[in-house]
């Protein structure tokens, strides 16, 4: 769907900004290990997004090995727990013909995500991904 994670990032950032959110792209080389790609704030909330681009991901996919770098899952889960389970980090994955939103409420063994997990949402479009994201963020309030 997107040629690269950077291309996905640009489209997602633009859509979030058009909805009134402030988006800060994090340069990973300048931060500690595990910090996600984007910090998003606005409309009375804030959350982190880790972005992935996985061309092999399709609507038919049931299990996915996510290419999290060392420290990314622990950082996200620790952030969630330290904020009393009301602040979120999500991994958003752009696939070939779908998107996946992973709410980082737990650590996934061996980076394997079952797409029927209660923390995982498969979406057919970027619009559906964003609607699901905002629904999850608002559930935390």
Q: What residue ranges belong to the model's regions?
A:
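Catalytic phosphate/metal-binding cores of nucleic-acid and nucleotide-processing enzymes, i.e., regions
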Residues: 1-141
